[in-house]
Amino acid sequence: MGNLKCELTYLPEVSYALYQNYVPIVRELLLTNEGNTALENLELSLSIDSFGRFPYQQKIALLGAHETLHFTDDLHTLSIDPTAILQRTERVDTVLRLTLQDATGTTLHSELFPIALLPFDYALQIDTLPEMLAAFVTPNYPAIAPILQRASHTLFQWTNNGSFDGYQSEDPNRVRKMMAAVYYAIVQEQLIYSALPPSYEKCGQRIRMCDTLFTQRMANCIEIKSSLCRLS
């Protein structure tokens, strides 16, 4: 229907870290009736083709002539299937589908917006959402345990106490020694500096998870820093 106009503010690329931290895919939706006739009993729907988990649906009792409705609340209900990202090793392009129907199920307006799903190890929007890097601090990976055991051995040699008791000792110097032991354990891994893992994206980067990092023994600056955080 040519009298309907939709404006969407959304993320053109979606990553697992964004999903896990409840960053909404769609931030704002404007629906305008540019015609001279009011529309009643409408249903607005947003979904992601092939990889959507929960669509966004909204009942609209009345959309007046030349009226614009502004949607921001509950848009976070639109989400992807997380397994769709966990199974990806490369970017997958799909579409965000918007549909507006009347009470009879007749489609009054339909529009497609391009969107992409990125691999789970991809860090997006480092410049605008740097806090998302914290999602890659994964202290429960099994690959962490051998590094901590080595650090504990070093800590015991230095202090006769190999326990990682954090601030329970109430001794700032002990905390420093714990961090030094962790750092020394990572140094012993003899990591080779390696540039960013291969990717075709224009922004963001892949981040090697700790199992890959300590197996391949290659890492860049962000990966080494995230490893220190994982072990802290």
Regions found by a protein language model. Give the residues of each.
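Short acidic/proline- and small/hydrophobic-mixed sequence motifs that coincide with surface turns
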Residues: 36-41, 108
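Asparagine-centered strand-capping/turn motif at beta-strand->loop junctions
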Residues: 29-36
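Cysteine-centered nucleophilic/redox motifs
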Residues: 217-232
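Short beta-strand elements
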Residues: 105-138
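Secondary-structure boundary elements
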Residues: 136-216
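Low-complexity, acidic Ser/Thr/Pro/Gly-rich terminal tails and inter-domain linkers that flank the onset
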Residues: 1-24, 49-52
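Intrinsically disordered, low-complexity Pro/Gly/Ser/Thr-rich segments with frequent PxxP/GP/PP motifs
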Residues: 45-92, 100-104
